[in-house]
Amino acid sequence: DDRRSPLEECFQQNDYEEFLEIARNSQLYQESLREDSSYHLSFIESLKSDALFSYEKKFWEADGIHGGKVINDLSLIHDLPKREIQALCYPSIKK
């Protein structure tokens, strides 16, 4: 199958900026802009299985530099510590 997902294309081309553009236009990201505090927990649960966040993790693990901007956005949106969101989504990240 030579039809790759747009996220896989970005990863293969090491194009983190394009990945961010896709991420920020995604339904998950747009839904995260809601201010309903009861939504936070189910939102964070959804991050664990969402393709966006698996690619965010892949970018991070590939070079230790890219990745984390989407998490940073979300920590600001939800007023949650970035470390808390990272720990929930990416247990392997130590920073």
Swiss-Prot record:
One of its GO terms (molecular function) is toxin activity. Expressed by the venom gland. Keywords: Antibiotic, Antimicrobial, Apoptosis, Cytolysis, Disulfide bond, FAD, Flavoprotein, Glycoprotein, Hemolysis, Hemostasis impairing toxin, Oxidoreductase, Platelet aggregation inhibiting toxin, Secreted, Toxin. N-glycosylated. Its main location: secreted. One of its GO terms (biological process) is defense response to bacterium. Its cofactor is FAD. The keyword Membrane does not apply. Its EC number is 1.4.3.2. One of its GO terms (cellular component) is extracellular region. Homodimer; non-covalently linked. Catalyzes an oxidative deamination of predominantly hydrophobic and aromatic L-amino acids, thus producing hydrogen peroxide that may contribute to the diverse toxic effects of this enzyme. Is highly active on L-Met, L-Leu, L-Phe, L-Trp, and L-Arg, and no weakly or no active on L-His, L-Tyr, L-Ile, L-Gln, and L-Lys. Exhibits diverse biological activities, such as antibacterial activity against both Gram-positive (B.subtilis) and Gram-negative (E.coli) bacteria, and inhibition of ADP- or collagen-induced platelet aggregation. This is L-amino-acid oxidase.
